[in-house]
């Protein structure tokens, strides 16, 4: 019991992170497999769609899970997400045309998005304060392990000269979903959710089981009382806990902004672009075919090892400073990487330097932004809105929504053109000058009137 139980729960629930890492990573190698390319013959735009559509499903999965997690409890919400992961994996593995593959990716994305929202909240709510960073950080560790296994699975299957080359890796997506579904039966429910639903005796029992040893039972009871009082106070302050209410209350709005901001800044580091198109990056550096897939496997393994080591220190570190230092370090590596890839001809040393920068970037990410983003975003919301707030914040972690950035910029551009830009079609250059209120410009009508007047005076003088 105690710490061993907390760690076990963190790891079992963290299988959702494994799913996220595997499902994201497996397409990195799959889109480079010869048999996959022969089967679907995708154009470059379709490759992007196959990769990104999982994130579209994840967006809606995140939003849906917030409400379900409040209604059903964290455990049942986890099981709900697993069902979609298993069904989606089966559809992808059995796909014989692009539409079926896309539907499978969408369904899997919905399940992964649901789990991405629910599990970190669950991990944060069952963790003693001292160990919260480590327990929630298990999500990133499992994600890194899943990504590494996906890369090595793709590399191993690349030696098979049949559709098994890509069907088997996609089918394996369902396995961790099945394991997590049945493993959820053995997870204790979140004590905070139990208190929220007036199951006080059950909540106290869970808190006592989760504390490190019997000598801390008094501390466990004290934390239980703190949970009860906090939730009672939250209920008294605001009976309504809808999504709309989160935007109405200033304090909740700030938490949502900070939670979403963490995920937005994480994506703006560039990590997801590098991860999804890793084999293409290696190809551009001169490592093609199976060599690129092999390097992807090494890349994933380095990430898993780095994250594992980081978990021993994450509960002792502050949150903000490591993230800021990581941004500065990643900036430097990206500048060097850009310089190397911009070179018209890369020698052996240039190729190795580019690969080294990609690996260094990933090590920095896995030791800072990787684990700390999950921790910070899951712990800043109060119990009353934790699932809903985190669901909206984590929806920002679904990369497809960056298309909305271009939706917004296109719409704003249309408004700017409508209200600020004058029409120039069919006008002389001098008339266009007048549109900008240039007082030195003489309007054509004025010129014409003066010309008519001079002509008239000239005619009259002759007569």
Curated annotation (Swiss-Prot):
Subcellular localization: Membrane
InterPro entries listed in its UniProt record: MFS_dom (IPR020846), MFS_sugar_transport-like (IPR005828), MFS_Sugar_Transporters (IPR050360), MFS_trans_sf (IPR036259), Sugar/inositol_transpt (IPR003663), Sugar_transporter_CS (IPR005829)
PROSITE patterns associated with the record: MFS, SUGAR_TRANSPORT_1, SUGAR_TRANSPORT_2
Membrane spanning residue stretches: 5-27, 46-66, 83-103, 106-126, 141-161, 168-188, 256-276, 293-313, 323-343, 355-375, 402-422
Organism superkingdom: Eukaryota
Purpose: MFS-type transporter; part of the gene cluster that mediates the biosynthesis of echinulin family alkaloid.
Protein name: MFS-type transporter criB
Organism: Aspergillus cristatus (Chinese Fuzhuan brick tea-fermentation fungus)
């Amino acid at each position: 019991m105690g710490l061993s139980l907390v760690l076990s729960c963190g790891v079992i629930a963290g299988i959702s992170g494994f799913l996220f890492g595997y499902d994201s990573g497996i397409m990195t190698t799959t889109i480079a497999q010869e048999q996959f390319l022969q089967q679907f013959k995708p154009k470059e735009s379709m490759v992007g769609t196959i990769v990104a559509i999982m994130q579209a499903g994840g967006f809606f999965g995140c939003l849906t899970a917030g409400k379900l997690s409040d209604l059903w409890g964290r455990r049942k919400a986890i099981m709900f997400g697993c069902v979609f992961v298993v069904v989606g994996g089966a559809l992808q593995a059995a796909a014989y045309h692009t539409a079926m593959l896309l539907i499978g990716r969408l369904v899997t994305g919905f399940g992964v998005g649901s789990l991405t929202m629910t599990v970190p909240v669950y991990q944060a709510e069952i963790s003693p304060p001292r160990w919260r960073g480590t327990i929630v950080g298990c999500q990133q560790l499992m994600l890194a392990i899943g990504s590494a296994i996906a890369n090595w699975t793709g590399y191993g299957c690349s030696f098979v000269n049949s559709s098994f080359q890509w069907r088997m890796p996609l089918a394996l997506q369902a396995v961790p979903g099945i394991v997590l579904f049945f493993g959820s039966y053995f997870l204790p429910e979140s004590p905070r959710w139990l208190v929220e639903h007036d199951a006080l005796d059950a909540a106290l029992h869970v808190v006592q089981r989760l504390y490190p040893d019997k000598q801390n039972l008094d501390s466990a009871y004290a934390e239980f009382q703190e949970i009860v009082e906090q939730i009672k106070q939250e209920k008294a302050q605001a009976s309504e806990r809808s999504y709309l209410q989160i935007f109405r209350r200033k304090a909740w709005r700030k938490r949502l902004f900070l939670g979403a901001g963490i995920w937005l800044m994480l994506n703006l580091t560039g990590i997801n672009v590098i991860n999804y198109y890793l084999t293409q990056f290696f190809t551009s550096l001169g490592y093609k075919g199976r060599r690129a897939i092999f390097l992807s496997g090494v890349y994933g393994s380095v990430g898993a090892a780095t994250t594992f080591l980081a978990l021993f220190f994450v509960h002792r570190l502050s949150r903000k400073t490591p993230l800021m230092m990581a941004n500065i370090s990643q900036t430097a590596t990206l500048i060097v990487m850009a310089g190397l890839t911009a070179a018209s001809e890369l020698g052996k040393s240039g190729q190795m330097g580019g690969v080294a920068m990609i690996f260094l970037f990933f090590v920095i990410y896995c030791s800072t932004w990787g684990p700390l983003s999950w921790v910070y975003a899951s712990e800043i919301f109060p119990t009353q809105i934790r699932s809903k707030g985190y669901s909206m914040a984590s929806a920002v972690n679904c990369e497809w929504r960056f298309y909305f950035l271009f939706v917004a910029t296109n719409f704003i551009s249309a408004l700017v053109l409508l209200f600020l830009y004058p029409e120039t079609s069919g006008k002389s250059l001098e008339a266009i000058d007048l549109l900008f209120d240039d007082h030195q410009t003489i309007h054509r009508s004025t010129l014409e009137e003066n010309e008519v007047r001079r002509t008239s005076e000239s005619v009259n003088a002759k007569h």
